[in-house]
Structure formats: structure tokens, C-alpha cells
């Protein structure tokens, strides 16, 4: 069942019903998902599995692949790990209507970009420089990014430390700029690389963005800040190639499961690329799809 949920993301199949049709019609699909015979489970069987498995078991797939990647030295071969911190919006699975309306009670209205708002969730993620997510937290879209820094920075250092590594730099965009965030990062023994907004009078760092979004300041910090795109690359891979934006589940637990499956696919690709001796394909999801 878990293999089928991964296969669903790789093949960009939008719903469980269409997944079942693909499994029924295509023998190769049943073989990949390890279903024997000529018949595949029905969509209600998958729905029952998802409900009974729970978020812990589904997220266990992500953590298992992530830990395997750490042991193989895929996530970051260096002892000092640089991480990038950011969040991305996911539209809630809901629609208006007196008779056919669907609601997601846990979702809230939040920013999708600078000017637009929608009902949804935000995935707050810490990613390595190899564009692989180390850990993540899912919250309603109206929760401030800075409020999730503490839980994210409590989990990531513990995980990295298990493999004899430490976090040396935390790179983030200017919405994370605050004295509390800087203090939390420095408490870990890491250096914050977060530009200050234009309205700050006494900045904590020699790094800022111009009106045209060009980064200025200390050349060393400018070079480090440009590494922030690693977390954006992981979001891009999830949304464009693994249907991370095609959220068809409701409730925070199932949204976490959806994100865990997408991130697990990224690790599956990275691990397979290294095992076949093609590490340059570690971030190429398209190279491993039909």
C-alpha cells in the first residue's frame, strides 16, 4: 500500500480512484507496487488503509528513508551542516456549496504571496544544501513563520548530532529576522544568515535586500545567503513533480501524511541514484519516472 502511494506521486495520479484504475489496467504498475495477480485493491481499501495507518506510520516512511540517506552520507557529507529554513503554502481541499460543499476545519486563511490570501496550510521545512528536507512542521496558513523556528531548530540539531554532525549555519529569508530567532540559532552554536528588513534601525547583521531584491552586505554572508535556494528547490520538486500542491486530504494529520509521502519520494530518488552509481541524478525525479 505504501509503495502504491509513492507510485501515485511519481506518476502524478491525482486521486485514489484513478490510481486504482491505473493498477487494474497496467501490469507494470501492479508489479512495482508488489500487488500479485490481475486485480488491485479498490479505492475504499486505500482510504481505509490511510485512516488506520495514521500519521505516525506514514511519517515513519519518511524518517526511515531520511535516516538511511544520512547513514549513506547523501544529505551532507561534511561534519558542519548548513541548513536553509522556509515555508510554503498549500491550498486546503475545500469548496463552497450548500449541498456539495467540503470544508477543512483545521485550515485557516493565510498569505499565498504578497497580495493574495487563501484557505490552506503552510509546510515549514528545514532543508540541507542537497535540497533534501531534514524535518518539517505543518500548521494552518495564518501561523507566523517565526513561531515555528523553535520546534524546527529543536528537532534538526538532535537528528544531525546522531550522525556525528552539527549545524553550522541557519539560512533564511528576511521574514524570519528577529532578535528571538537570532538568539535561538546562536544557542545551537550556529551562525544566523538572515537579512534584515528595510525598516530596521539597529540591524543585528550586515546583510540586507534592496528594493529590487538584490542581496547586499558582507561578501561572505552574501555568498552564504545565496545557498538559501536549496529549500526552494525541495519545494519546487515537491510541487511540480510530486503533486505536493494537489492536496486531496483534510485535517492536519492527513496533510502531514501527504507531505511525508512527497518528501519520502525525494529521498527514495536520492538513495536510488547513489546506489546505481549516478549521484548526479539525486535530485532528478524525472529520471526515475515512466
Residue spans for each PLM region:
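Short, positively charged, Gly/Tyr-enriched micro-motifs
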Residues: 1-61
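Basic, amphipathic alpha-helical segments enriched in Lys/Arg and hydrophobic/aromatic residues
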Residues: 221-290
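Short acidic/histidine-centered micro-motifs embedded in hydrophobic/aromatic stretches
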Residues: 22, 64, 241
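Helix-centered, glycine/charged polyanion-binding patches within enzymatic domains
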Residues: 169, 174-240
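Polybasic low-complexity intrinsically disordered regions
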Residues: 48, 52-187
Amino acid at each position: 500500500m505504501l509503495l502504491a502511494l509513492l507510485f501515485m506521486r511519481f506518476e502524478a495520479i491525482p486521486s485514489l480512484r484513478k490510481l486504482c484504475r491505473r493498477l487494474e489496467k497496467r501490469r507494470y504498475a501492479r508489479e512495482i507496487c508488489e500487488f500479485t495477480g490481475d486485480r488491485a485493491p479498490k479505492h475504499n481499501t486505500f482510504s481505509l488503509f490511510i485512516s488506520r495507518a495514521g500519521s505516525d506510520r506514514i511519517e515513519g516512511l519518511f524518517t526511515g528513508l531520511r535516516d538511511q540517506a544520512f547513514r549513506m552520507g547523501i544529505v551532507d557529507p561534511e561534519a558542519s551542516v548548513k541548513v536553509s529554513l522556509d515555508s510554503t503554502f498549500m491550498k486546503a481541499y475545500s469548496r463552497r456549496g450548500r449541498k456539495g460543499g467540503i470544508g477543512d476545519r483545521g485550515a485557516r486563511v493565510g498569505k499565498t504571496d504578497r497580495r493574495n490570501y487563501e484557505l490552506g496550510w503552510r509546510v515549514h521545512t528545514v532543508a540541507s544544501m542537497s535540497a533534501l528536507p531534514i524535518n518539517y512542521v505543518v500548521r494552518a496558513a495564518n501561523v507566523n513563520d517565526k513561531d515555528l523556528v523553535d520546534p524546527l531548530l529543536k528537532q534538526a540539531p538532535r537528528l544531525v548530532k546522531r550522525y556525528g554532525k552539527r549545524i553550522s549555519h541557519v539560512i533564511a529569508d528576511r521574514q524570519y529576522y528577529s532578535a528571538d530567532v537570532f538568539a535561538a540559532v546562536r544557542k545551537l552554536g550556529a551562525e544566523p544568515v538572515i537579512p534584515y528588513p528595510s525598516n530596521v534601525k539597529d540591524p543585528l547583521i550586515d546583510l540586507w535586500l534592496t528594493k529590487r531584491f538584490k542581496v547586499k552586505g558582507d561578501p561572505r554572508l552574501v555568498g552564504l545567503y545565496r545557498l538559501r535556494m536549496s529549500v526552494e528547490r525541495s519545494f519546487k520538486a515537491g510541487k511540480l513533480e510530486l503533486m505536493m500542491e494537489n492536496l486531496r486530504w483534510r485535517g492536519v494529520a492527513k496533510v502531514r501524511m501527504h507531505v511525508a509521502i512527497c518528501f519520502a519520494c525525494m529521498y527514495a530518488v536520492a538513495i536510488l541514484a547513489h546506489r546505481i552509481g549516478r549521484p548526479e541524478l539525486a535530485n532528478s525525479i524525472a529520471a526515475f519516472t515512466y
